Each structure stands twice: as structure tokens, then as C-alpha cells.
Amino acid sequence: LTYGVSVLVISCPCALGLATPVAIMVGNGMGAKKGILFKNATALENTGKAKNIVLDKTGTITTGKPEVTDVIHTGEFTREELLETAYSLENNSEHPLAKAIVQYCEKNHIGKQEVTEFLSETGNGLRGKINDVPVAAGNIEYVKEFTKVSQKYTDDANRLAGEGKTPMYFVSDGKLAGIIAVSDTLKEDSISAVKHLKEMGLNVTMLTGDNKITAQAIAEKVGIEHVVSNVLPDVKEKVVKEQSLDGITIMVGDGINDAPALTRADVGIAIGAGTDIAIDAADIVLVKNQLEDVPKAIRLSKMVLKNIHENLFWAFIYNIIGIPLAAGLWYPFTGIRLSPMFGALAMSLSSFCVVMNALRLNLKK
């Protein structure tokens, strides 16, 4: 009876049951203090196992606050006419680049007209009518549907793109009105964050709706070799899906267009300053809007996983040694047996050790 009670007491799976949840609880608390919010335990565990990471450009690598840098009008339109067309069209869009043009025009006291039959084609451009005159704005492929673009203006756009700017073409009444270039500055910690991600052995990919030349210029500045440009929202999701086949993949973004990819990824990380849809779709939210918090989240996940393994190891060692001892299997050879009282003490100590080992995470930075 004594042996039976001792085995029953010492085999209580408290240490094993506490090994994982206590470490995860401490990890979540540490993350919250650093402005890294894990929505679920799976995200906390998978982040440290990631092999690939996909970064959206606008609002993630860059500040997401672009500004107009160049205004080039054609011979058939004045600068004011180009800006008025641009202001009227872009005022109907919520895209960050559109907001940059609107702010620029408002600052320069440019007038605007009412746009009818407005249509926004995600990833391509805008179209509508101003006083029954058809107008359009977008990338080179999109505006080719409405007008011919001479080599001179194509060269101008390529030059601007090579400087890391995003050129947008504007068409009015079937004629090219001009080009407006917008530039988004890099976040202060983007270069260091990408460097740390690569040092962790992650395959880093940048996604952007910008053209290839602009995308490559930005990628070179931050040290990213793999770039996918001219992407639409569904293409972002496809890229993430393909990378997930090669291992656990993290997607980092902040916009409405990133939501499908964030949902598709094994771990979706939303920048805190992003849209509500992106934040809802993500598994992790970075409150501080800093890209450097991504490698911090990965390091935290790795520490938690290591701690869980340590807890499970010692919990199993405790059971492997304690249960045979409580059952009296060692008594014929050593004369040692464990009373129920000491069995209860050993069980309590094992749980205490697991909890203290998990709390030890708080000592790490």
C-alpha cells in the first residue's frame, strides 16, 4: 500500500503538464513588454522554426509615408494641368502613393475637378472621367491601354526608378500628360533588421507592387537579393504559399493588400501602424512599428522553444528516476525506499523547478 501511494503521488504529471504552458506564458509576457504581441501559442512556437521570411516593401521596409519628388509634364500639358488631373484622380484612392500626391497638390494649392465613372484596378491604376474627358493613371503597362508612351518619357521613368522612386504615368483624353515620381524613405532600422534576419539563416524575400527597377534599387539598399516586383495581392499570397512548401514561412506586412498573404503564411506578422484588416489577419502584432522587432520576435521564440525542451527533459528525468524509486524497484539493491511524504515533496520540487526555469527567461534580454 505504501509503495502504491508513493507511486501515485510522485507520478502526478504536474511537471510535464507545466513544462510547455509556463514557458509560453512567460514568453508572451516578455513579448508584450517589448511591444511584440503573440496572438496564440502556435505563433510563438513556429516563429523560431521559420526558414523563410517575406517582407512587404511599403510600410514595412519603408516608412509608408511617401513624398512627391519629381513632376514631369509633356509639351501638350502644363505642370498645373498635370497636377490637377493627378489630384482629381488620386483624391479618390486610399493608396499611400495617392495620398502623397494629394498632400503635395494641397500644399501647392492645386485645384481639383469631380471625377465620374471612377474605377480603381488594384495593382495597376485608376481611371475615370473629368468633364466627360477620359483620364487614367498608373504604371506603364496600364496606361498603354490609353495612349502611346514615347521612348523619352520611358527613359525618364526608368531613370527615376533607378533612384528608388516610383514613377506614375498620367493620361488625359488619350494623350500622355506627364509623369509624377514618388519616393518612400527607408525605416532607420531596415538595413540592420535584414542583416540580423540573414545572420539567423533565414531566406529573405521582398515583395512590392513597384516595377523591377525601383524594387531592385530599394532591395540593394537594404541588402535583399531575392525580389518579386509588380505583384498583385493574389500574387503575394501565391509567393508565400510556394515558400511555405520549402519550410515554415513568415510574412510581414501592414496593408489591406497584405491580408491574404498574412493569412496564408505559417506565421503572419503585422506592423502596428498598419490597417485593421492586416492586424486582424496576423498572428503577431508589432506595436512599435519597428522592423527590428521581427528578429527580436524570432530570438524570443527560439529561447522559449529551448526552455520548453529543457523543462520536458528534466520532467522526464524526474519521472524516470522517481517512479521506480517510489515503486521500490531499487530497494532490494540499495535498501532505499521512498515514503509517500517524500514522494509528495519530490513532486512539488519538480514542479517548482520547471516554473523557476521558465521564469529564468526574464533574465535574458
Where are these regions (language model features)?
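Hydrophobic "anchor" residues
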Residues: L16, T60-I61, L176
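P-type ATPase nucleotide-binding
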Residues: I72-M200, K212, I224-V240
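Asp-based phosphoryl-transfer active-site loop
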Residues: A43-D70, L262
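Conserved ATP-binding TGD loop and adjacent catalytic N/P-domain core of P-type ATPases
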Residues: F38, A50, I130-D132, G164-T166, ...
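Hydrophobic alpha-helical transmembrane segments
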Residues: L1-L55, V228-S229, R299, M303-K365
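Short hydrophobic beta/alpha edge segments that flank linear recognition/processing sites
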Residues: N28, E67-V71, A86
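Ser/Thr-glycine-rich phosphate-binding loops at phosphate-binding pockets of nucleotides
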Residues: T20, T58-T63, T208-G209, L232
